[in-house]
Amino acid sequence: MEIAVFGGGAWGRALAFAFGEKNEVKIISRRDLNEPLKKLNDALISKGSAPIEQVDLERGLKAALYVIAISVQHLREWFQNASLPKNAKVLIASKGIEVLNKAFVSEIAKDFIDPNALCFLAGPSFAAEIIQGLPCALVIHSNNQALALEFANKTPSFIRAYAQQDIIGGEIAGAYKNVIAIAGGVCDGLKLGNSAKASLLSRGLVEMQRFGAFFGGKTETFLGLSGAGDLFLTANSILSRNYRVGLGLAQNKPLEVVLEELGEVAEGVKTTNAIVEIARKYGIYTPIASELALLLKGKSVLESMNDLIRRA
């Protein structure tokens, strides 16, 4: 089966490689991917799979299934420009909350596609590990279980993909863990110790679940791969962009400098502000996100972390 992956960043390329084991994959990106795809295609060909082919948007839209790995902040614009066919089957692999409209991913997508044709990818994974073929377990959330299973069955041998409902819980967990991951990086950067880190992540998980429950997310989603699993991975690894943002802030570097040095998108930065504004609107208690928002605006890192540990 032919699958189109939209987005040529590290995550998009990793997903193209993963789906390429069993399927013909077309990737659509504004950047030239000839060099980045070379090693991935060599690996696919060695396994007897077809190489990933970069194509234009018109050609990509002819695929049977779509995987979208576009930054959440540009997702609405992408949908507007792409003009997906009415029968599109979509798996969104972007994690975050749209800052401009304070919208979750599914809220953006429903303006352009049938909600029953939408899936959301969640769970603990890094692009750098997927392209090495290292094993992981992910969750495909959808109100349409048949479609979720269809996508799950297309994943490679090294990925265990579960099909679950609760799409709102899955996408909130995927967005919120990036916020806690920044705080986790700060905690480690300040060398506050394992006990403080455990407290931070435990309370972060509770905060994530509290926020998600307000919008109908299920507790089991936040305690599973989509929530706890992704949180524990992202908040503890140097492979995490958001964790590295926290490490940079712990060195008293201005946020602008941290992001410039990162050279990649860290969705947790903008997601933090979106969560705080949504929480304020609905009266949801989010002490970690609220304190982190102050830190991102320039509050002293030591003062912020001390206040955070006491409040959370």
From Swiss-Prot:
Give its localization: Cytoplasm
Q: Which domain of life is it from?
A: Bacteria
Which residues are annotated as active site? K177 (proton acceptor)
Provide the GO biological process annotations: carbohydrate metabolic process; glycerol-3-phosphate biosynthetic process; glycerol-3-phosphate catabolic process; glycerophospholipid metabolic process; phospholipid biosynthetic process
Query: Which reaction(s) does its UniProt entry say it catalyses?
Result: sn-glycerol 3-phosphate + NAD(+) = dihydroxyacetone phosphate + NADH + H(+); sn-glycerol 3-phosphate + NADP(+) = dihydroxyacetone phosphate + NADPH + H(+)
**Statement: the UniProt record of this protein carries the keyword Lipid metabolism:** yes
> Pathway of this protein?
Membrane lipid metabolism; glycerophospholipid metabolism
Q: What class of enzyme is it?
A: oxidoreductase
* The enzyme's E.C. designation: 1.1.1.94
**UniProt-recorded name of the protein:** Glycerol-3-phosphate dehydrogenase [NAD(P)+]
Q: Which HAMAP family does its entry note?
A: NAD_Glyc3P_dehydrog (MF_00394)
Query: What does this protein do, in the record's words?
Result: Catalyzes the reduction of the glycolytic intermediate dihydroxyacetone phosphate (DHAP) to sn-glycerol 3-phosphate (G3P), the key precursor for phospholipid synthesis.
Which keywords label this protein? Cytoplasm, Lipid biosynthesis, Lipid metabolism, NAD, NADP, Nucleotide-binding, Oxidoreductase, Phospholipid biosynthesis, Phospholipid metabolism
User: Which family does the similarity line name?
Assistant: Belongs to the NAD-dependent glycerol-3-phosphate dehydrogenase family.
PANTHER family, per database record: GLYCEROL-3-PHOSPHATE DEHYDROGENASE (PTHR11728), GLYCEROL-3-PHOSPHATE DEHYDROGENASE [NAD(+)] 2, CHLOROPLASTIC (PTHR11728:SF1)
Matching entries from Pfam families are given as: NAD_Gly3P_dh_C, NAD_Gly3P_dh_N
The positions annotated for binding NADPH are W11, R30, R31, K95, A127, R241, V265, E267
For this record, the Gene Ontology CC terms, alphabetical, are: cytosol
Q: Does the keyword NADP apply?
A: yes
Matches recorded under InterPro entries: 6-PGluconate_DH-like_C_sf (IPR008927), 6PGD_dom2 (IPR013328), G3P_DH_NAD-dep (IPR006168), G3P_DH_NAD-dep_C (IPR006109), G3P_DH_NAD-dep_N (IPR011128), NAD(P)-bd_dom_sf (IPR036291)
Which lineage is the organism of this entry classified under, starting from the top rank? Answer: Bacteria, Pseudomonadati, Campylobacterota, Epsilonproteobacteria, Campylobacterales
Q: Which residues bind sn-glycerol 3-phosphate?
A: K95, G123, S125, K177, D230, S240, R241, N242
A Gene Ontology molecular function term for this protein is: glycerol-3-phosphate dehydrogenase [NAD(P)+] activity
